[in-house]
Amino acid sequence: MVGENDRISSFINSLDVGNLPFLDEMERQALEDQVPIIRKDTQALLKFLLAMNKPKNILEVGCAIGFSALLMGYYSEPDTKITTIEKFEKRIPIARDNFNKYDPDNKITLLEGDATEILKTLSPG
């Protein structure tokens, strides 16, 4: 028996037309390197929510290699700004390189450090 959550998940996934090739490559590499990134159903949900809500500002805590920030950057409005925080020193240069390569509009700002400290310094909007 298909539950309500399964139907909703199936509906949201049916709206997803896939990712841009560079995101597919990043996802493949992340899986190979065992870097945690968001799953396919979460990717579809994020795209759906971005299309519905059209946020102007997004805060992400924990970007790993930058996959989800880049996904949100490409599937959000042109004037959307994304602030992402990462503390794992090994992943920060990889995320920064990915943002330099794939964020030509500079929608994404990477803050380095512990989110509990950085969040105290941020102002709304």
Language model features with spans:
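A short alpha-helical cap/connector motif
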Residues: M1-G125
